[in-house]
Amino acid sequence: MAGGCAYAALWPGSQLFGATLIAPARPGELALTFDDGPNPAWTPRLLEILAREDVHASFFLVGSKAETETSLVRQIAEAGHLIGNHSWSHRNLALAPARLIDEELRRTTETLEQIIGAPVRTFRPPFGARRPAVLRIARRLGLVPVLWNAMTSDWKIPSAEAIAERLARTIDRLQWRGRAANIVLHDGSHAEPAADRAPSVAAAEKLIARYKQSRRFVRVDAWG
Protein backbone atom coordinates (compact mmCIF):
# COMPACT_ATOMS: atom_id res chain seq x y z
CA MET A 1 0.00 0.00 0.00
CA ALA A 2 2.76 2.46 0.94
CA GLY A 3 4.57 1.76 -2.30
CA GLY A 4 1.40 2.34 -4.31
CA CYS A 5 0.79 5.67 -2.59
CA ALA A 6 4.37 6.75 -3.25
CA TYR A 7 3.98 5.83 -6.93
CA ALA A 8 0.74 7.80 -7.20
CA ALA A 9 2.26 10.81 -5.46
CA LEU A 10 5.58 10.99 -7.28
CA TRP A 11 5.54 9.14 -10.61
CA PRO A 12 4.67 11.71 -13.30
CA GLY A 13 2.68 9.24 -15.37
CA SER A 14 0.42 8.14 -12.52
CA GLN A 15 -3.22 9.24 -12.76
CA LEU A 16 -4.33 7.42 -9.59
CA PHE A 17 -4.79 10.62 -7.57
CA GLY A 18 -6.52 12.44 -10.43
CA ALA A 19 -6.05 13.41 -14.05
CA THR A 20 -3.08 15.52 -15.08
CA LEU A 21 -2.00 16.86 -18.46
CA ILE A 22 1.05 15.02 -19.74
CA ALA A 23 1.10 14.61 -23.54
CA PRO A 24 -1.41 13.53 -26.18
CA ALA A 25 -1.17 11.00 -29.00
CA ARG A 26 0.57 13.50 -31.31
CA PRO A 27 3.98 11.98 -32.03
CA GLY A 28 5.01 14.90 -34.22
CA GLU A 29 4.88 17.41 -31.35
CA LEU A 30 7.34 18.40 -28.64
CA ALA A 31 6.84 20.77 -25.71
CA LEU A 32 9.91 22.31 -24.11
CA THR A 33 9.13 23.25 -20.51
CA PHE A 34 11.39 24.97 -18.00
CA ASP A 35 11.04 24.82 -14.22
CA ASP A 36 12.30 26.76 -11.18
CA GLY A 37 12.81 30.18 -12.79
CA PRO A 38 12.83 32.99 -13.44
CA ASN A 39 16.61 33.10 -13.20
CA PRO A 40 18.35 36.33 -14.24
CA ALA A 41 21.58 34.42 -14.82
CA TRP A 42 20.22 31.92 -17.36
CA THR A 43 16.65 32.68 -18.45
CA PRO A 44 17.68 35.60 -20.72
CA ARG A 45 20.13 33.37 -22.61
CA LEU A 46 17.41 30.77 -23.01
CA LEU A 47 15.02 33.41 -24.33
CA GLU A 48 17.61 34.47 -26.90
CA ILE A 49 17.88 30.91 -28.20
CA LEU A 50 14.12 30.42 -28.36
CA ALA A 51 13.64 33.74 -30.18
CA ARG A 52 16.36 32.98 -32.71
CA GLU A 53 14.85 29.56 -33.44
CA ASP A 54 11.25 30.84 -33.38
CA VAL A 55 10.27 28.26 -30.76
CA HIS A 56 7.67 28.87 -28.06
CA ALA A 57 8.04 27.09 -24.72
CA SER A 58 6.36 26.85 -21.32
CA PHE A 59 7.89 28.31 -18.16
CA PHE A 60 6.69 27.12 -14.75
CA LEU A 61 7.75 29.89 -12.40
CA VAL A 62 8.28 29.96 -8.64
CA GLY A 63 6.18 32.80 -7.25
CA SER A 64 8.71 34.13 -4.75
CA LYS A 65 11.28 34.43 -7.54
CA ALA A 66 8.83 36.00 -9.97
CA GLU A 67 7.99 38.67 -7.40
CA THR A 68 11.60 39.90 -7.47
CA GLU A 69 12.14 39.47 -11.24
CA THR A 70 9.04 41.14 -12.65
CA SER A 71 10.70 42.53 -15.78
CA LEU A 72 12.08 39.11 -16.67
CA VAL A 73 8.66 37.51 -16.18
CA ARG A 74 7.16 40.10 -18.53
CA GLN A 75 9.90 39.42 -21.05
CA ILE A 76 9.04 35.71 -21.03
CA ALA A 77 5.35 36.41 -21.57
CA GLU A 78 5.88 39.10 -24.21
CA ALA A 79 8.00 36.66 -26.22
CA GLY A 80 4.95 34.42 -26.56
CA HIS A 81 5.87 31.76 -24.04
CA LEU A 82 3.41 30.21 -21.62
CA ILE A 83 3.66 31.25 -17.97
CA GLY A 84 2.69 28.54 -15.49
CA ASN A 85 2.44 28.26 -11.70
CA HIS A 86 5.19 26.27 -9.91
CA SER A 87 4.07 27.21 -6.37
CA TRP A 88 5.30 30.06 -4.21
CA SER A 89 8.22 28.43 -2.40
CA HIS A 90 8.80 25.13 -4.23
CA ARG A 91 7.82 23.03 -1.24
CA ASN A 92 6.56 19.46 -1.50
CA LEU A 93 2.82 20.09 -1.63
CA ALA A 94 2.00 16.40 -1.21
CA LEU A 95 3.12 16.82 2.41
CA ALA A 96 1.44 20.18 3.01
CA PRO A 97 -1.95 20.87 4.64
CA ALA A 98 -4.77 22.05 2.40
CA ARG A 99 -4.61 25.61 3.72
CA LEU A 100 -0.94 25.90 2.75
CA ILE A 101 -1.51 24.32 -0.67
CA ASP A 102 -4.20 26.90 -1.37
CA GLU A 103 -1.95 29.74 -0.21
CA GLU A 104 1.03 28.56 -2.29
CA LEU A 105 -1.01 28.29 -5.48
CA ARG A 106 -3.29 31.27 -5.02
CA ARG A 107 -0.48 33.68 -4.13
CA THR A 108 1.62 32.57 -7.09
CA THR A 109 -1.24 32.85 -9.57
CA GLU A 110 -2.21 36.30 -8.30
CA THR A 111 1.40 37.51 -8.47
CA LEU A 112 2.00 36.19 -11.97
CA GLU A 113 -1.28 37.54 -13.31
CA GLN A 114 -0.55 40.96 -11.85
CA ILE A 115 2.86 40.97 -13.52
CA ILE A 116 1.84 39.80 -17.00
CA GLY A 117 -1.73 41.12 -17.10
CA ALA A 118 -3.12 37.82 -18.36
CA PRO A 119 -4.65 34.67 -16.85
CA VAL A 120 -2.41 31.89 -15.56
CA ARG A 121 -4.10 28.54 -16.10
CA THR A 122 -1.42 25.85 -15.74
CA PHE A 123 0.33 24.44 -12.68
CA ARG A 124 3.23 22.05 -12.27
CA PRO A 125 3.64 20.66 -8.74
CA PRO A 126 7.19 20.92 -7.38
CA PHE A 127 8.98 17.57 -7.69
CA GLY A 128 5.84 16.34 -9.49
CA ALA A 129 4.54 15.51 -6.01
CA ARG A 130 0.79 15.53 -5.48
CA ARG A 131 -2.07 13.96 -3.61
CA PRO A 132 -5.81 14.33 -4.21
CA ALA A 133 -5.98 17.61 -2.27
CA VAL A 134 -3.24 19.18 -4.41
CA LEU A 135 -5.07 18.41 -7.65
CA ARG A 136 -8.47 19.33 -6.23
CA ILE A 137 -7.28 22.72 -4.97
CA ALA A 138 -5.47 23.43 -8.23
CA ARG A 139 -8.62 22.79 -10.25
CA ARG A 140 -10.72 24.86 -7.87
CA LEU A 141 -8.35 27.74 -8.57
CA GLY A 142 -8.74 27.22 -12.32
CA LEU A 143 -5.35 25.58 -12.81
CA VAL A 144 -4.66 22.58 -15.06
CA PRO A 145 -2.09 20.27 -13.40
CA VAL A 146 0.75 19.54 -15.83
CA LEU A 147 3.34 16.78 -15.43
CA TRP A 148 5.80 15.41 -18.04
CA ASN A 149 7.01 12.30 -19.83
CA ALA A 150 10.58 13.26 -20.74
CA MET A 151 13.05 14.30 -18.07
CA THR A 152 16.61 13.59 -17.07
CA SER A 153 18.43 14.91 -14.02
CA ASP A 154 19.71 17.94 -15.92
CA TRP A 155 20.38 19.78 -12.66
CA LYS A 156 23.20 17.38 -11.80
CA ILE A 157 24.56 16.41 -15.23
CA PRO A 158 27.48 18.69 -16.21
CA SER A 159 27.37 17.87 -19.93
CA ALA A 160 24.86 19.42 -22.33
CA GLU A 161 25.57 16.60 -24.76
CA ALA A 162 24.68 13.96 -22.17
CA ILE A 163 21.46 15.75 -21.21
CA ALA A 164 20.38 16.14 -24.83
CA GLU A 165 21.22 12.55 -25.76
CA ARG A 166 19.32 11.08 -22.81
CA LEU A 167 16.29 13.19 -23.60
CA ALA A 168 16.52 12.35 -27.31
CA ARG A 169 16.33 8.65 -26.52
CA THR A 170 13.15 9.24 -24.54
CA ILE A 171 11.69 11.51 -27.23
CA ASP A 172 12.35 8.94 -29.95
CA ARG A 173 10.86 6.16 -27.83
CA LEU A 174 7.74 8.24 -27.24
CA GLN A 175 7.38 8.88 -30.96
CA TRP A 176 7.60 5.16 -31.63
CA ARG A 177 4.78 4.72 -29.10
CA GLY A 178 2.71 7.40 -30.82
CA ARG A 179 3.03 10.06 -28.10
CA ALA A 180 4.10 13.68 -28.00
CA ALA A 181 7.01 14.57 -25.71
CA ASN A 182 6.58 16.89 -22.72
CA ILE A 183 10.19 17.73 -21.89
CA VAL A 184 11.39 19.15 -18.56
CA LEU A 185 14.57 21.20 -18.20
CA HIS A 186 15.53 23.68 -15.49
CA ASP A 187 16.59 27.29 -15.98
CA GLY A 188 16.64 27.84 -12.21
CA SER A 189 17.19 25.97 -8.96
CA HIS A 190 15.01 25.83 -5.87
CA ALA A 191 17.94 24.79 -3.67
CA GLU A 192 20.96 26.64 -5.10
CA PRO A 193 20.21 30.13 -6.48
CA ALA A 194 23.67 30.32 -8.07
CA ALA A 195 23.50 26.87 -9.67
CA ASP A 196 25.07 26.62 -13.13
CA ARG A 197 22.32 26.05 -15.69
CA ALA A 198 24.55 26.41 -18.74
CA PRO A 199 24.33 22.67 -19.54
CA SER A 200 20.53 22.74 -19.43
CA VAL A 201 20.32 25.83 -21.63
CA ALA A 202 22.78 24.36 -24.13
CA ALA A 203 20.88 21.06 -24.10
CA ALA A 204 17.68 22.90 -25.06
CA GLU A 205 19.52 24.46 -28.00
CA LYS A 206 20.78 21.04 -29.09
CA LEU A 207 17.30 19.51 -28.92
CA ILE A 208 15.86 22.32 -31.02
CA ALA A 209 18.57 21.83 -33.64
CA ARG A 210 17.96 18.09 -33.66
CA TYR A 211 14.18 18.15 -34.00
CA LYS A 212 13.19 21.46 -35.54
CA GLN A 213 12.96 20.10 -39.08
CA SER A 214 11.01 16.95 -38.18
CA ARG A 215 8.80 17.93 -35.22
CA ARG A 216 6.60 20.83 -34.17
CA PHE A 217 7.43 22.64 -30.94
CA VAL A 218 4.32 23.70 -28.99
CA ARG A 219 3.34 25.16 -25.64
CA VAL A 220 1.65 22.70 -23.29
CA ASP A 221 -1.61 24.65 -23.45
CA ALA A 222 -1.92 23.46 -27.06
CA TRP A 223 -2.83 20.10 -25.52
CA GLY A 224 -5.68 21.15 -23.26
List PLM regions with ranges.
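Hydrophobic alpha-helical topogenic segments used for membrane insertion/localization
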Residues: 1-10
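Active-site beta->alpha N-cap acidic-glycine motif
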Residues: 9-96, 100, 104, 109-116
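C-terminal domain-boundary segment and adjacent tail
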Residues: 14-26, 52-54, 67, 194-224
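A cross-domain feature marking catalytic cores of carbohydrate-active enzymes
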Residues: 34, 61-63, 85-87, 125-127, ...
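Charged helix-capping and loop-helix junction motifs
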Residues: 74, 101-105, 160-167, 197-204
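A short acidic, helix-capping loop that chelates divalent metal ions and anchors anionic groups
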Residues: 91-96, 156, 191-194
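His/Asp/Glu-enriched short active-site or ligand-binding loop at hydrolase and phosphoryl-transfer sites
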Residues: 129, 135-176, 215-224
